[in-house]
C-alpha cells in the first residue's frame, strides 16, 4: 500500500516526466496563460530558433497590465511603450496560432480572472503564467504558479517546465467567519501570522471549515495572495462548490466527459495521515477586518488596532525596516487605524475584481455618497464581470455614489498604465501588494477587503465595517 499523499504530491506525481538524481524534475504543463508584459522576449526566442508553440490549444493570451481602463480606450493606447507591448502580443498570438483576447473583446480581463471564467482552469492541472499571482488558479485544486520569461519560452516550446519539488505546508482555518470578515481578511491574517517569508520553499494547502465555506471567488482571493506569504503556490481541494462553478463554462467538459472529470476531481484531496512539513492553524471566529499599515503585506493590524511601534521589535534589521515603512507611509506609532484618512479608493485587481466583490461593495455604498475628499474607482476584473455587474445594475449604484466605473484591466494594482497614485496620495486598495511605489511613485497603499474599501470611500477614512450603518 502506498504512503498517504498530499494534494500537492498527487498533482506533482501525475505530471512528473523525469527526475534527476539531484531532485531536478521535468513537469508536464496542462495550461499556459500569457500576457503582454512577460511574453515578448519568449515569442522572439521561438522566432529566432525557428520553433513553434507546441500546444496552442493549451495556451491562452490576453492583454491586462498595460491597457487603459478609461471609457475611451477603444480610441487606442496613448502611452507608446504600453501600446507597443499590446500590439506585439496581438502579432505574436496571430503568428503562433494562440487564442488571444484583445482589449476590445468582452472576454478580455485580468489573466487570473479570465482563466477560471472560461473554464480554461480546471482541477488537477498544472498551470503557469509569467505572473506571480498565477497561484490564484490553485483555488480549483490545481498546481499553479508564476514563471520567468525564459521559462515562458520553454513552456511555449516544450509544454514542460524544469522544477524542484517544494515542501508541503497546511494552513488550517477552522471556525465560522464573523459578519463583516471576508476571504481577504483571512489571507491578510495568514500573511500577518507567517510573514512574507513564512511560505518560502513551500506549497500551501488551505483547509478547514472557514475555507470550505467560501465561494470560488473567496477561494481565489485566498490562493491569489499565497505568493505574498512567500509560497510557491497555494491550493484548495475541489468540492461541490468547485464543480458547480465549472459547469457550463465555455471550455469546461460537458455531459459524460464532465461526469468522468468530476469522478477524477473527487480524488484530488490530501489523504488521511499525509505528511505536512509545517502546519499553521487559525480560528476564523476570532478574525477582525484587517488593514495593512506599512509597505509589506505582513504589516497588518485589526481595523480597531493602532499603528505599531517598531521600537518593540528586537531584531535590529527588521526594526529599521519597519521604521522606514512608517516614514514612507507618513504614519506615527499609536495612530488609530480608523483615524487614517484616504485620498483614493481602488476596488478591483486579480485579488478582488470579481462579481462577488463588486456586489459586496455595492451593498455598502448604495444610497450613499463618496466623501468629497476621496477619488474612488471600480475596475471590473473582466469584460464578463463588467457585463454581469451592469445587468444587475451595480454600475448605476456606484456611479450614483460618485465612483468612477471603468473598463477591465489590472489598473491601479500596479503603476504600469494610466491609473496610478500621485506622490503622497493614500489609497485604500483591494489589490495584493503595498510595496513602495507599487501603485505609483511615492504612493501609499493600504490593503483591505472590498467592503472595507467601499466604506472608506464613503467615510473618507478607515471604518470598522462591522459597525457600518
Curated annotation (Swiss-Prot):
The keyword Amino-acid biosynthesis applies. Its cofactor is [4Fe-4S] cluster. Its EC number is 4.2.1.33. GO terms for biological process: L-leucine biosynthetic process. Belongs to the aconitase/IPM isomerase family. LeuC type 1 subfamily. HAMAP family: LeuC_type1. Binds 1 [4Fe-4S] cluster per subunit. Pathway: Amino-acid biosynthesis; L-leucine biosynthesis; L-leucine from 3-methyl-2-oxobutanoate: step 2/4. The keyword Transmembrane does not apply. Catalyzes the isomerization between 2-isopropylmalate and 3-isopropylmalate, via the formation of 2-isopropylmaleate. Keywords: 4Fe-4S, Amino-acid biosynthesis, Branched-chain amino acid biosynthesis, Iron, Iron-sulfur, Leucine biosynthesis, Lyase, Metal-binding. PROSITE patterns: ACONITASE_1, ACONITASE_2. [4Fe-4S] cluster binds at residues 350, 410, 413. Pfam families: Aconitase. It catalyses: (2R,3S)-3-isopropylmalate = (2S)-2-isopropylmalate. SUPFAM superfamilies: Aconitase iron-sulfur domain (SSF53732). GO terms for molecular function: 3-isopropylmalate dehydratase activity; 4 iron, 4 sulfur cluster binding; metal ion binding. It comes from Rhizobium etli (strain ATCC 51251 / DSM 11541 / JCM 21823 / NBRC 15573 / CFN 42). The gene is leuC. This is 3-isopropylmalate dehydratase large subunit. InterPro entries: 3-IsopropMal_deHydase_lsu (IPR004430), Acnase/IPM_dHydase_lsu_aba_1/3 (IPR015931), Acoase/IPM_deHydtase_lsu_aba (IPR001030), Aconitase_4Fe-4S_BS (IPR018136), Aconitase_4Fe-4S_dom (IPR036008), IPM_dehydratase_rel_enz (IPR050067), IPMI_cat (IPR033941). Heterodimer of LeuC and LeuD.
Amino acid at each position: 500500500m502506498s504512503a498517504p499523499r498530499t494534494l500537492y504530491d498527487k498533482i506533482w506525481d501525475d505530471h512528473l516526466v523525469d527526475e534527476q538524481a539531484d531532485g531536478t524534475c521535468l513537469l508536464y504543463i496542462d495550461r499556459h496563460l500569457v500576457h503582454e508584459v512577460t511574453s515578448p522576449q519568449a515569442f522572439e526566442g521561438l522566432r529566432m530558433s525557428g520553433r513553434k508553440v507546441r500546444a496552442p490549444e493549451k495556451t491562452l493570451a490576453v492583454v491586462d497590465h498595460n491597457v487603459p481602463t478609461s471609457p475611451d480606450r477603444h480610441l487606442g493606447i496613448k502611452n507608446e511603450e504600453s501600446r507597443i507591448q499590446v500590439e506585439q502580443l496581438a502579432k505574436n498570438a496571430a503568428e503562433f496560432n494562440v487564442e488571444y483576447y484583445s482589449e476590445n473583446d468582452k472576454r478580455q480581463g485580468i489573466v487570473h480572472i479570465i482563466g477560471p471564467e472560461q473554464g480554461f482552469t480546471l482541477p488537477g492541472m498544472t498551470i503557469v503564467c509569467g505572473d506571480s499571482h498565477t497561484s490564484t488558479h490553485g483555488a480549483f485544486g490545481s498546481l499553479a504558479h508564476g514563471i520567468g520569461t525564459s521559462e515562458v519560452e520553454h513552456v511555449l516550446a516544450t509544454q514542460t517546465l524544469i522544477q524542484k519539488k517544494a515542501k508541503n505546508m497546511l494552513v488550517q482555518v477552522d471556525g465560522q467567519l464573523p459578519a463583516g470578515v471576508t476571504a481577504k481578511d483571512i489571507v491578510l491574517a495568514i500573511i500577518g501570522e507567517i510573514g512574507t517569508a513564512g511560505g518560502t520553499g513551500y506549497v500551501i494547502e488551505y483547509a478547514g471549515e472557514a475555507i470550505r465555506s467560501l465561494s470560488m471567488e473567496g477561494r481565489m482571493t485566498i490562493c491569489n495572495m499565497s505568493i505574498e506569504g512567500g509560497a510557491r503556490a497555494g491550493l484548495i481541494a475541489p468540492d461541490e462548490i468547485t464543480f458547480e462553478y465549472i459547469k457550463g463554462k465555455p471550455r469546461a467538459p460537458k455531459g459524460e466527459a464532465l461526469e468522468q472529470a468530476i469522478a477524477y476531481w473527487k480524488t484530488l484531496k490530501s489523504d488521511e495521515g499525509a505528511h505536512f512539513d509545517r502546519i499553521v492553524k487559525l480560528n476564523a471566529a476570532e478574525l477582525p477586518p484587517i488593514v495593512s499599515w506599512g509597505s509589506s503585506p505582513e504589516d497588518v493590524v485589526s481595523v480597531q488596532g493602532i499603528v505599531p511601534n517598531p521600537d518593540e521589535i528586537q531584531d535590529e534589521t527588521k526594526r529599521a525596516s519597519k521604521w522606514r515603512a512608517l516614514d514612507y507611509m507618513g504614519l506615527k506609532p499609536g495612530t488609530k487605524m480608523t483615524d487614517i484618512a484616504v485620498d483614493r479608493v481602488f476596488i478591483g485587481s486579480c485579488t478582488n475584481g470579481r462579481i462577488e466583490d463588486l456586489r459586496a461593495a455595492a451593498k455598502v455604498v448604495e444610497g450613499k455618497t463618496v466623501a468629497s475628499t476621496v477619488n474612488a474607482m471600480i475596475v471590473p476584473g473582466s469584460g464578463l464581470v463588467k457585463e454581469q455587474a451592469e445587468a444587475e445594475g451595480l454600475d448605476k449604484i456606484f456611479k450614483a455614489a460618485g465612483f468612477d466605473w471603468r473598463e477591465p484591466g489590472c489598473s491601479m494594482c500596479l503603476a504600469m498604465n494610466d491609473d496610478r497614485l500621485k506622490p503622497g496620495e493614500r489609497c485604500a486598495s483591494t489589490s495584493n501588494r503595498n510595496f513602495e511605489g507599487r501603485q505609483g511613485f511615492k504612493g501609499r497603499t493600504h490593503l483591505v477587503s472590498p467592503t472595507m474599501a467601499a466604506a472608506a470611500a464613503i467615510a473618507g477614512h478607515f471604518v470598522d465595517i462591522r459597525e457600518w450603518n
